């Protein structure tokens, strides 16, 4: 029926049905255009949405369809090739995804040849995305707000994630204001990481690359905003280290008035319950290997037999230099100073509870597998490879996040604009574009930023730091994007 109608208006006559009278002659295009104020696109919609009532005259319906088709395709103005392109383009727009529909509309494509050239160039619509709202999909223009992301190396050590499950600050000393403010902004990590930590490879399956003693840990820096957005979110913050000073204060007797102190509560995946570690805000200088890792230690009540009688009260004892190797508990001693009391385990106790130590930085772990995962942060070893693109990761959880870029899975949805994200940290950063929150402030000029990566980049202006060095010349840069642009000059010079 549609084919017959298409041929009928091109010949200037309508289709006849058996036994019916011949229809009247078609009105001229000028008469049709004068009777209809609608544009061709409106006639196109009316033509496709036309419905004939049951009791209406089919001949009149046929005339109406022919008229609408004539007003849409305009055979008096267009050639047969142009009309064919219009029909093919219409079916293309119906059957193709919404992204390609936007691409055609944005570029004003009018012919199949132009559309083929557009598709060969692999062009894609910019600043548009498909969002779901109330069960329906809509095209939405994206905002210009950029989102920050930390590099994949921030989760090289699973204890960096598990130790910061919950963080709170109870009281704050005047000299501890800086450290306490940092503790208040520690991010909460989803329980997914605790479940994934059991999947790390055992040490027997880990192959060490290079000499660990000759390597040093790489500094954890925020990635530039123009880096890949779909790897891993920044989830770590400086962990509490034990002061290595002979005048360190340990323990506090019950019944005495507590002094102001900063209390940090860390939940570790290695232990079934949380432990509270009270530390001094100002740490003294010392080798990193001597700084003991307090995570995973459970506080236990001191036993009468475990308290050394040889050390007088009021005299502080350096941690790790106990003369009695069998001493398993903490001696309650005091030292004068402004800092509050801090609980310190003995060196022997740390070695028993955390028997596996890193040869590079001295950090200790309860399980050998955890040490093997941590060592990858020094060696740069990446055991988990994506089977689609070949990209490698240090941990399985990083690979799982990356695979969402291939599958298109976006489980986290903004409840304001319904935009979806692959990771919860991305959603948290995105919500700041709605609230206008700028939680990161520069200490030098008091300028505030929405994302921490922006603050890190801004602080390099004050410090003059240029951590990104070119491997082919002595120049260094403060931003990775600037380094990439500089490296292009070397490649262009080599190609010429």
Swiss-Prot record:
Annotated zinc fingers (C2H2-type), start-end: 356-378, 384-406, 412-434, 440-462, 468-490
CDD domains: SCAN
Any one GO CC term of the record: nucleus
Region (Disordered): 1-38, 149-188, 203-347
Keywords, comma-separated and alphabetical: Metal-binding, Nucleus, Repeat, Transcription, Transcription regulation, Zinc, Zinc-finger
A Pfam family that the UniProt record links to this protein: zf-met
Biased composition regions of type Basic and acidic residues, renumbered to the chain: 210-223, 253-263
Localization per Swiss-Prot or TrEMBL: Nucleus
GO terms classed as biological process: regulation of transcription by RNA polymerase II
InterPro entries named among the record's database cross-references: SCAN_dom, SCAN_sf, Zinc_finger, Znf_C2H2_sf, Znf_C2H2_type
Domain SCAN box: residue ranges: 44-126
Function: May be involved in transcriptional regulation.
Family matches, as PANTHER family: GASTRULA ZINC FINGER PROTEIN XLCGF49.1-LIKE-RELATED (PTHR16515:SF49), PR DOMAIN ZINC FINGER PROTEIN (PTHR16515)
Protein name according to UniProt: Zinc finger and SCAN domain-containing protein 5C
GN (gene name): ZSCAN5C
């Amino acid at each position: 029926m549609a084919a017959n109608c298409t041929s009928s208006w091109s010949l200037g006559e309508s289709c006849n049905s058996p036994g019916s009278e011949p229809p009247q002659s078609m009105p001229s295009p000028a008469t049709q255009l004068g009777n209809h104020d609608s544009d061709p696109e409106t006639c196109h919609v009316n033509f496709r949405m036309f419905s004939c009532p049951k009791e209406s005259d089919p001949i009149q319906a046929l005339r109406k369809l022919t008229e609408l088709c004539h007003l849409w395709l305009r055979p008096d103005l267009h050639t047969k090739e142009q009309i064919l392109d219009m029909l093919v383009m219409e079916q293309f727009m119906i059957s193709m995804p919404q992204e390609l529909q936007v691409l055609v509309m944005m570029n004003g494509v009018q012919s199949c040849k132009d559309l083929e050239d557009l598709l060969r160039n692999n062009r894609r619509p910019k600043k548009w995305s498909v969002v779901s709202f109330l069960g329906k999909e809509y095209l939405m223009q994206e905002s210009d707000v950029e989102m920050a992301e930390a590099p994949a190396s921030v989760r090289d050590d699973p204890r960096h994630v598990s130790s910061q499950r919950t963080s709170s600050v109870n009281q704050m000393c005047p000299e501890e204001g800086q450290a306490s403010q940092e503790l208040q902004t520690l991010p909460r990590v989803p329980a997914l990481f605790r479940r994934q930590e059991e999947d790390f490879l055992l040490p027997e399956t880990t192959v060490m690359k290079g000499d660990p003693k000759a390597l040093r840990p790489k500094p954890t820096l925020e990635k530039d905003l123009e880096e890949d957005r779909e790897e891993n979110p920044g989830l770590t913050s400086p962990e509490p280290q034990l002061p290595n000073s002979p005048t360190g204060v340990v323990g506090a007797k019950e019944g005495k008035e507590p002094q102001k102190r900063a209390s940090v509560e860390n939940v570790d995946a290695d232990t079934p319950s949380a432990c509270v570690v009270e530390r001094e805000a100002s740490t003294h200088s010392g080798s990193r290997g001597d700084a003991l890792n307090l995570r995973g230690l459970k506080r236990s009540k001191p036993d009468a037999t475990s308290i050394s009688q040889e050390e007088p009260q009021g005299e502080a004892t350096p941690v790790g230099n106990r003369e009695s190797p069998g001493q398993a508990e903490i001696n309650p001693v005091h030292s004068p100073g402004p800092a509050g009391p801090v609980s310190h385990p003995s060196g022997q106790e740390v070695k028993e509870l955390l028997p596996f130590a890193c040869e590079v930085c001295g950090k200790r772990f309860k399980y050998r597998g955890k040490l093997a995962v941590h060592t990858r942060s020094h060696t740069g070893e990446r055991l988990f490879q994506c089977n689609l693109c070949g990209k490698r990761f240090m941990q399985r959880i990083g690979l799982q996040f990356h695979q969402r870029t291939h599958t298109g899975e976006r489980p986290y949805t903004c409840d304001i604009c319904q935009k979806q994200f692959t990771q919860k940290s991305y959603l948290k950063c995105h919500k700041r574009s709605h609230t206008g929150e700028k939680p990161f402030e520069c200490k030098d000029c008091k300028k505030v930023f929405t994302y921490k990566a922006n603050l890190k980049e801004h602080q390099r202006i004050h410090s003059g730091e240029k951590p990104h060095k070119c491997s082919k010349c002595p120049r260094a840069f403060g931003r990775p994007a600037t380094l990439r642009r500089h490296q292009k000059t070397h490649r262009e010079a080599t190609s010429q």
